[in-house]
Amino acid sequence: GLPNHNVNNTSLKEWMEDGEYMNNIRNEMLDADSDFEFTKKACKRCIADERRYGRSRRTASIKIASNDSTYWQMIEDEVKMFQMTGQFQMEQRMIEVQLKVYGDECNLDCFMCMHDNSSIRQKVASEGVWSDEVFGSYSWNVPVDTIDKQTGVVKKANMKNFKNGNIDGNNVEDMIEQTMKIAPYIRSIKIIGGEPLIMKKHYELLKRLIAADQAQHIIIKYQTNLTETKAGNHNIFDYIPHFKLVCMVASVDGVGKTIEYMRRRTDWDKVIKNTEYCRRYDNVNVDFNGLVSLLSVMRFYEVIDYCLDNPIIDQINWALLETPINFRVNNLPEKIKKGLLPKYELWPDIQAALKLPQDPGADIQEVFDYLLKGDEYYTGTRWESHLFDIFPELEEFYIKPEDRDRKHQKNKKVVAAHIGINKATTFATSDDYV
């Protein structure tokens, strides 16, 4: 299994230099005859993505790192040293530290986001926008014992039961101290939320790095929705000039009304305004990084075109959504998937996802029910938007709940007649609905 190491019992330096887990992986990757026992566990997401789509975060990271000859040489030097000594030691400024320790505070309600990553998602779920069928199998994400089984509503008082794995305040301070101890070896720090730019606590780390004269050597990366740039008295633009480089990796997988629907509470004009403001600084890059889901894939080519047409965006990248399974690209109706294939002729990984068969048990009617529940929740607010207005091509596949039993029974009879038996033995899936 995976190791029992966490921030409570293992420092960053111990994890990188002395950790048996990391050293096992290093040894396997340098052994051509290895069975890759540990690597298969640690890298299972990338292995799965490469098998399904021919592309993963691993392949993207290798491409980015190898394009920087100085950084790539550092990596090669460390590999050679480990081969000679069997030990990894921090000697060069080449480490990336990823910090997901500042909580789940977020200002958006993105339909595909796991609830443990967003305080707004938790609030909206607690007020009734929830689906056991879509999210119920992800036990770390469920508000345990809080859903009223008759109404399907999560009780507000129990919102704290959402499991998010964040560490407490004392450990946040400890993480700052640990980060400062290895600061001379840090090439980049990636801050992950929630929405990091509105998390006040992370600015304490930035202040410490500036005061220690380390900031000028370090790249700061944000996985951000880029809708807000201030948190209380903190303004990210006051900190930017002190760092070697600041990379704003904006979560953008739709343009205009599309992203405003999928990532509810987004203001597209504000995202662009903040992007333009970021580019006033010579040491800021803005990248778009999208999550390709069954909704976004219907318009994601617009994001690609936008980036190609607008030089304020440095690069675009994307990942294919894996969970919740119902939201995967391959679970769209076949008619829509076939129609989208020509739009992604230059993007074989997205085409590969579109060509995959539907996952067993994935039912687009459950997706419709969940999304329409969200539409109802936002009716009358400034974030009001409706699924079939934004994605009208989906409406023909929607079956009203009161009509589904008749459709289900009809399909069972057709199947029974086809195989020459008197009683249907095949149950309807979402294929029956599309």
Specify the residue positions occupied by each region the protein language model found.
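Membrane-interface junctions of multi-pass transporters
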Residues: 2-48
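Iron-sulfur (Fe-S) cluster-binding segments and ferredoxin-like electron-carrier domains
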Residues: 2-9, 49-61, 116-122
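Local cysteine-cluster metal-coordination motifs and their immediate loop/turn environment
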Residues: 39-51, 105-116
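Recognition helices and adjacent regulatory flanks at domain boundaries
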Residues: 51-97, 105-108, 129
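Core AdoMet radical
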Residues: 94-105, 116-171, 183-200, 212-232, ...
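Low-complexity, serine/threonine/proline-enriched polar segments
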Residues: 133-177, 329-370
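Leucine-rich repeat
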Residues: 176-182, 207-213, 237-241
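Conserved C-terminal portion of the radical SAM core fold
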Residues: 221, 243-252, 267-425, 429
